[in-house]
Amino acid sequence: MRVQRVVMPGSGSESWTVVGDDHVPVAPVERFLAYLASIERSPNTVKAYAHDLKDWFSFLAVHGLDWQAVTLEHVARFVAWLRLPPAARDGRVSVLPTVEHHCGGASVNRKLAALASFCEFHARLGVPLAGLLVTMAPAGQGRSSVTSYKPFLAHIAKHTAQRRRAITLPAPVPRPQVLSAA
């Protein structure tokens, strides 16, 4: 499976698609990426989503899963699979616990965000994937603010449920480097 660049004849606009091992575009991914291009998402966003969904469909192919019948447990296994080095992803090589993760937390979270958008898009088309990666949490639960600042009209939305991702990895926040006097 690979990501292929597509240049539209006439307009010259650039897009991306995921091509399977049979050299045919993967239909559900192609439909989603065409939707992103039609609502004028950045070509870089379309390219990143194509790479992320290529990883998802590669995982599904390795494990013999149907994309329409996945569960949250499969997504958790996908996260663990992403953290493995590429040579160990086929399952024939064991990885020692001392080996560093291949994908960092921020990269995995971006891939999960792409997968959540993909599932939400297809849920609107009738595929039963709506609650796979997004849960509704009561308002006020979750991350607490360090300050007491509340935006104007915050009291209006305090009783509505908020969307939360079901799986999120901690991503280290990079610290700025200190400038030297020299």
At which residue positions do the language-model features occur?
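General helical secondary-structure elements
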Residues: 1, 37, 106-107, 146, ...
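Contiguous hydrophobic segments
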Residues: 1-12, 104, 118-129, 180-182
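Long, amphipathic, Lys/Arg-enriched alpha-helical "connector/arm" segment
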Residues: 92-96, 100, 147-182
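N-terminal core-binding DNA-recognition domain of tyrosine recombinases/integrases
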Residues: 30-44, 54-153
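Short, flexible segments with low predicted structural confidence
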Residues: 17-21, 28, 46, 155-159, ...
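N-terminal DNA-binding module of tyrosine recombinases/phage integrases
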Residues: 2-39, 61-62
